[in-house]
Amino acid sequence: MLYAYYDQWSADRNLFSDLQIASSSSFSRHFQNYPVLYLDMTDFVTRYDSVNIVEHIQSDVISELKEVFPNIQHRNDRDLSDVLLDIVLQEPRQEKFIMIIDEWDAILREFKNENGVDDKYIKLLRGLFKSTNAMSTFAGVYMTGILPIKKYNTQSALNNFHEYSMVQPGPMADCFGFTSDEVRSLCAKHHMGYEPLEEWYDGYQIGGKVGMFNPTSVMIALYNQYCDTYWANSGAYDTVASYIRMNFEGLKDDVIRLLAGEACPVETSSFQNDLNVVRSKDDVLTVLIHLGYLSYDRNSRTCRIPNREVATEFKNSIVSETGWGVVATAINQSEQLLADTLASKSNSVAKAIDVIHSDNTSVLQYNDENSLACVLTIAYYAAKKDYLMIREFPSGKGFADIVLLPRPNCTQPAVVLELKYDKSADTAIEQIYDKRYAGSLSDFAGEVVLVGINYDKATKQHECKIEKLKA
């Protein structure tokens, strides 16, 4: 769209007529008024190796420029910055260039500084955009990608750009995904319900905007007419796994809490915007924010898994990762735990939770009911397929610890889990009745399963009591 807007040779002048930009006072001043250089770095990555890719970027672009502007006399026809300036100075009525670099960081992500390619590439960009030629050559430059521009020490390598990222989106926050209004409009157009898309693809909090959707997945879901995980990278679980296997202090604990639906604090400023320089838990979480696997709340400085699509990728990563055996086992056995819960097999439920707790004590330490809730959220992970799992569900006279609400087309009963620490399962059940938690589930036909779970710190055993009542 940027290319079509700026490029002086674009033919379609009606493309923007029904869009907001057409009403801007500066629209006509810039519309299709510039020669545009468009580079897709993924194209170069597929054609060249790390040894000479930077040289080929220059030579390929220069060769094409010579074909378009054959009458220019060049002082140095091997330097792209000089070639561009020569064209601007010598071509009659020549406007400055607009340059668009798509997937600017593909080289950094693909080659990971193989043969020193990172530094060569950054040097090329600095030569283009920070040289004395830059102001005379370019009317504007746009670079899109996953990562912000690489830092050297604490400064950006190209500090004359306005940078907008998942962590610092500035006024561009609306442009990082689809808004809820846009998705509702698309759902109406494609005759598909809004709620499933909200569950699967919503949840990104970008800047102050709450409720941003993954646009690619939304469009594929609308085309296919069903929701699933549609990450463009079919090896998405490998990407997550490569970072969560890093053995930084506190990382495994945070990943478990993220899987359980909790938010985790993160300090994003230390990351150097370099995938080869990941030095801490905070760097890992920051990378996952930039890659779209985590949503970032700048006010609380916390991150969380945004939606069901990403949660599925996290789960796949952990199940396939050997270093996460005990957590993977808990996830794999969670279907049986749910079945035992619905069948009122309280002893089986208590024993299963004993095993999960024992296996995970090196990762998560029990110290209160919230820690117990975190482990139980993992223990009941399979329930997310048929249930909406809500922590601290507002109901009756307080908040139930965990509630499983049946999804549409699920015929199973709702489940209320009340957790106690060093008390009793009877006390947990009594609180469900006293606080009238089940009354808030009157919209769900059939039974409601009431589950009281207590952890005894002295015996390190769990006690479970299960009752059923009509909603």
Language-model-detected regions and their locations in the chain:
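Active-site metal-binding core of divalent-cation-utilizing nuclease and nuclease-like domains
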Residues: 87-93, 383-410
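Domain-level recognition of nuclease-like catalytic cores that cleave nucleotide substrates
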Residues: 440, 446-471
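Structural motif
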Residues: 96-98, 413-417, 449
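Phosphate-binding site recognition
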Residues: 1-368, 383-386
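Metal-dependent nuclease catalytic cores in nucleic-acid-processing enzymes
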Residues: 128-135, 286-294, 377-382, 431-451
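Mg2+/Mn2+-dependent nuclease catalytic core
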Residues: 118-124, 421-438
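Conserved catalytic cores of phosphodiester-cleaving nucleases, focusing on short active-site segments
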Residues: 2, 376, 400-404, 413-421, ...
